[in-house]
Amino acid sequence: MSSSYTITKKKKRDKNQYILGISFVLLLGSFFIPLVVLLPLQQALYHPFGYWFLEPPRSAYFIFTGSLVLLSLSLLMMISGLAKNKFAKGLIAAGIFISILLSVLSVDHYHYMNGNGIYINPFFGFGEKEFLWADVKEAKQIAVEEKNGLKDKNLTFVFKDGEQYSFLITETVRKAYPIFNVKLQEKGIQVTREFPE
């Protein structure tokens, strides 16, 4: 009887060490895993035909990071012995469920441009919002003041229905700028620059 108990206890200890290792990898990796995983995963899942660029908004990276931290903490709570009553077990299960849900939602949160227009898949939303180039009323490039001078920070599109959407000016957006600027000029729209006061 005692040898069976020892084997079971050893298996549980091995399982806990395995979970502990996973949770530490998730916790430490939560700051760089989104940078490495999120965009390639989105490109594999949502590879739209003929896009000029596809990227996750910055909020998708933050949410994905938060989901990994929450999953790591939930796993640590699970093996720490805090899950002795039903409430604690339910809290841990909810933490794991919410972290997985946030991960899925952050992978589904992206925006891209192509020859037809601008496509946005919001964090809380079902399906893409489509804004054709004919729907664009105004385009503004917003500069901010930094130590070294002015830097273009956001590219904001104002649509005819009054809605606005801002892209952070990343290297990807900067490379696509000449292409979508031609589309805007075809519609008689000039990108204006706004400076801080």
Segments (PLM) and residue ranges:
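A membrane-cytosol interface segment of integral membrane proteins
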Residues: 157-197
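A generic structural signal for ordered secondary structure
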Residues: 116, 128, 187-189
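N-terminal membrane-targeting/pre-transmembrane regions
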Residues: 1-84
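Non-transmembrane, membrane-adjacent beta-strand/coil modules in membrane-associated proteins
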Residues: 121-172
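Short charge-dense sequence patches
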Residues: 22-24, 80-92, 126-138, 180
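Internal/C-terminal transmembrane anchor helices
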Residues: 84-112
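Alpha-helical transmembrane signal-anchor/signal-peptide segments
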Residues: 108-126
